[in-house]
């Protein structure tokens, strides 16, 4: 008995060092983070609209005095404008009673027109104003994450990846519970902003951890494709999961289910990563400012930013546009994103492997062009079925870009800098967050000012124009001191070139400064 227990403990101890288990932890963290990111997409526009108009209807009802009839003997009829009902307490003529009931019914229709046609709102001005409000709420998470990322990158270099990873779980759990019980815009904004800090911890630490345990370029690309599949699954499940539970159970339900799943993730992290131990990197990483001056890293980061900015602009603006032009039901507001989510999942898994063979630069270039063209087609849709093809194209192409550029970030650090990954994946996450910070906030304002179709035209053209810059990532040159290290056969870090040795380098303003020790 003791021997079997000892063998089990030894097996569990060995599993803690398993690369596949670490990959699963990162996959699960990204899955839940992005479920929380997208579960609010169909809920918030409709929820804010409903609480705003409930408030307006209540103000109208409480401000209206009770009707008094001028004819004698009409005091036997009592009218309630709280629930718009008529109660007869005495004798009165049928004609007078019918007239007063008709008047009360007319008042009911006037004060509650929004509830009678909740799926097809007529208050165009209110919907336009909500573009800005919803856009700022969605952008707050990415903005906070954007500001937090550089600090998390430096922190992982000093104390390792497990503690920031577990901290991200704790913050995300608090944010999820806050979403469940928030009843005002202010508390929703705080919950969304708090999620940004947790996401920063999970994303930077998770990707850095994968890059450190998967040192081979091809294996790293495959692993990051799988991890991004978790992100894709979260984006896939979030909107329909949120919209269906919101319509048939209520606002609180999806967030409570999500909170339970987050607790499960925390338990696994606690067992495997042992976040109480500080595990600093064995060598000092390249300064963040040096990485930001590397033009190849900036091109890769720009691809991530502009590709994701397209879907980020869609998140607040598309549900409102659908409510305004298609009279869409609540559940349709989330299901509309389903094609993009499914295709993103397909794209990240297919091109996580294929991009290494065809060239990651080419994969990203084609992805940027497809993103732009698909976004340009979205305003042409007349109903929810017309959104299927362009949304599918958007998701698939963003999957191509993300699964190509994430491994390239680690590859560029191996090739041109010190192989410590916290800071470079902080830059990658900053790029991702810039797309999700600028996208909803600017997108909401642009949609209000010049309309949803012009918003899609602008971001579509930007993506297409940025695409040719990916050509410079075809064969980035190594720094001289790094080339000497990589040529050493005894070097413990293996990196496989993803282009042919005969391909020509394309230097673009390379920084000749040597790395600081």
From Swiss-Prot:
Residues that coordinate or bind serotonin: 231, 235, 308, 311, 315, 337, 344, 402, 436
Claim: Membrane is one of the keywords in the record: yes
Membrane-spanning ranges: 21-41, 133-153, 163-183, 193-213, 223-245, 252-274, 295-314, 332-355, 361-381, 393-413, 418-438, 444-465
One Pfam family recorded for the sequence: MFS_1
GO molecular function: monoamine:proton antiporter activity; serotonin:sodium:chloride symporter activity; xenobiotic transmembrane transporter activity
Extracellular side: 42-132, 184-192, 246-251, 315-331, 382-392, 439-443
Cellular component GO terms, alphabetical: axon; chromaffin granule; dendrite; secretory granule membrane; synaptic vesicle membrane; terminal bouton
UniProt name for this protein: Synaptic vesicular amine transporter
Family: Belongs to the major facilitator superfamily. Vesicular transporter family.
Glycan-modified residues: 84, 91, 112
Residues carrying Phosphoserine: 514, 516
Lineage top rank: taxon: Eukaryota
Annotated keywords: Cell projection, Cytoplasmic vesicle, Disulfide bond, Glycoprotein, Membrane, Neurotransmitter transport, Phosphoprotein, Synapse, Transmembrane, Transmembrane helix, Transport
Upper classification of the organism: Eukaryota, Metazoa, Chordata, Craniata, Vertebrata
Bilayer topology: Multi-pass membrane protein
Cytoplasmic side: 1-20, 154-162, 214-222, 275-294, 356-360, 414-417, 466-517
SUPFAM superfamilies, alphabetized: MFS general substrate transporter
Keyword Transmembrane: yes
Record GO biological process: aminergic neurotransmitter loading into synaptic vesicle; dopamine uptake; response to potassium ion; serotonin uptake; somato-dendritic dopamine secretion
């Amino acid at each position: 008995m003791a021997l079997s227990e000892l063998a089990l403990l030894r097996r569990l101890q060995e599993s803690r060092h398993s690369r596949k288990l670490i990959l699963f932890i990162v996959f699960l963290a990204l899955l839940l983070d992005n479920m929380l990111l997208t579960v609010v997409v169909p809920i918030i526009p409709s929820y804010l609209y409903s609480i705003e108009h409930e408030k307006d209807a209540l103000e109208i009802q409480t401000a209206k005095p009770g009707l008094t009839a001028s004819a004698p003997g009409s005091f036997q009829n009592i009218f309630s404008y709280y629930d718009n009902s008529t109660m007869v307490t005495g004798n009165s003529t049928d004609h007078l009673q019918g007239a007063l009931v008709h008047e009360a019914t007319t008042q009911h229709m006037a004060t509650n027109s929004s509830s009678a046609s909740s799926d097809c709102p007529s208050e165009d001005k209110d919907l336009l104003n909500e573009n800005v409000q919803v856009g700022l709420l969605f952008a707050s998470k990415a903005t906070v994450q954007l500001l937090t990322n550089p600090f998390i990158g430096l922190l992982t270099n000093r104390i390792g990846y497990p503690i920031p990873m577990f901290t991200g779980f704790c913050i995300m759990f608090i944010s999820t519970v806050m979403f469940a019980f928030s009843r005002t815009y202010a508390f929703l904004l705080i919950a969304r902003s708090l999620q940004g800090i947790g996401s920063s911890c999970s994303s930077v630490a998770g990707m850095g951890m994968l890059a450190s345990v998967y040192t081979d370029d091809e294996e790293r690309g495959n692993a990051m494709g799988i991890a991004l599949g978790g992100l894709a699954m979260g984006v896939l499940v979030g909107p329909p999961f949120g919209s269906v539970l919101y319509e048939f159970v209520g606002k609180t339900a999806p967030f409570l289910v999500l909170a339970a799943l987050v607790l499960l993730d925390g338990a696994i992290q606690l067992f495997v990563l042992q976040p109480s131990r500080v595990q600093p990197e064995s060598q000092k990483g390249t300064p963040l400012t040096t990485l930001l001056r590397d033009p190849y890293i900036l091109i890769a980061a720009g691809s991530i930013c502009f590709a994701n900015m397209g879907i980020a602009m869609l998140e607040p603006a598309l549900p409102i546009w659908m409510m305004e032009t298609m009279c869409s039901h609540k559940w349709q507001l989330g299901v509309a994103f389903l094609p993009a989510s499914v295709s993103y999942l397909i794209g990240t898994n297919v091109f996580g492997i294929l991009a290494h063979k065809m060239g990651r630069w080419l994969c990203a270039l084609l992805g940027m062009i497809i993103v732009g063209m698909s976004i340009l087609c979205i305003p042409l849709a007349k109903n929810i079925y017309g959104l299927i093809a362009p949304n599918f194209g958007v998701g698939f192409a963003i999957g191509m870009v993300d699964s190509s550029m994430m491994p390239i970030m680690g590859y560029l650090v191996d090739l041109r800098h010190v192989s410590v990954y916290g800071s470079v994946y902080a830059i990658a996450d900053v790029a991702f967050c810039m797309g999700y910070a600028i996208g909803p906030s600017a997108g909401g304002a642009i949609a209000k000012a010049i309309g949803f179709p012009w918003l899609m035209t602008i971001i579509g053209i930007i993506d297409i124009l940025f695409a040719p810059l990916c050509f410079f990532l075809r064969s980035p040159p190594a720094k001289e001191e790094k080339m000497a290290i990589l040529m050493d056969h005894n070097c413990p870090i293996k990196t496989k070139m993803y282009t042919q040795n005969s391909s020509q380098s394309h230097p673009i303003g390379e920084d000749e400064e040597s790395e600081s020790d």
